[in-house]
Amino acid sequence: MSRHWPLFDLRITTPRLQLQLPTEELCDQLIDTILEGVHDPDRMPFSVPWTRASREDLPFNTLSHLWQQLAGFKRDDWSLPLAVLVDGRAVGVQALSSKDFPITRQVDSGSWLGLRYQGHGYGTEMRAAVLYFAFAELEAQVATSRSFVDNPASIAVSRRNGYRDNGLDRVAREGAMAEALLFRLTRDDWQRHRTVEVRVDGFDRCRPLFGPLEPPRY
């Protein structure tokens, strides 16, 4: 399939992790990881409470979401749901997305990690991986992210990678108002805070899919 869709050959590698688009086998592993648990059931770290689905529905919902993201890839509106592998096993997803990237040169990120893989620094490392890809390969100028104020682990990941606070947002979460911290990372701040070695393979054939980059016009 990579002959026609080169993004399947993209690999982003750090000292402990490898990130790539999920194959059929990796989708199965991701579903197993989800069924083992992603967060404490008393908490909800996501604005869309997808983890509340029944065990019977979670596999289909997961596949449907991943396939929708892959099928909907366009150069002016894309999302890369990269499977995060530890010792060859898929333990979570690190997504990178953008709208009108050739013009805005801005990316956003989101992620989840299996509960038993949390607390080992993988969250910081997988974010560092996609930030390197965004700034070094795609030549992004700004990266954004957000975390609910009651999610200190996610907040810490952003701050360790050099993001600056960029305000608050109010959103509905499971029928109630919740506040989210907004974060912004410039190219200069990213370069100053880089601590993780990252290697990208297989991007040359992918580059045309992201379109010609235009200098920002204000």
UniProtKB/Swiss-Prot annotation:
Residues annotated as domain N-acetyltransferase: 32-188
Catalytic activity: L-lysyl-[protein] + acetyl-CoA = N(6)-acetyl-L-lysyl-[protein] + CoA + H(+); succinyl-CoA + L-lysyl-[protein] = N(6)-succinyl-L-lysyl-[protein] + CoA + H(+)
Any one GO MF annotation of this record: protein-N-terminal-alanine acetyltransferase activity
One of the GO BP terms on file: succinyl-CoA metabolic process
InterPro entries: Acyl_CoA_acyltransferase, GNAT_dom, Ribosomal_N-acetyltransferase
Pfam families: Acetyltransf_3
Swiss-Prot/TrEMBL keywords: Acyltransferase, Transferase
Binding of substrate, residues: 94, 109-113, 119-124, 145-151, 160
Family annotation (PROSITE patterns): GNAT
Enzyme Commission (EC) number: 2.8.1.-
GO CC terms in record: cytoplasm
UniProt KW NAD keyword: no
Function in brief: Acetylates and succinylates nucleoid-associated, DNA-binding protein HupB.
Family annotation (PANTHER family): RIBOSOMAL-PROTEIN-SERINE ACETYLTRANSFERASE
Record's subunit section: Dimer of dimers.
Name of this protein: Acetyl- and succinyl-CoA transferase Rv0802c
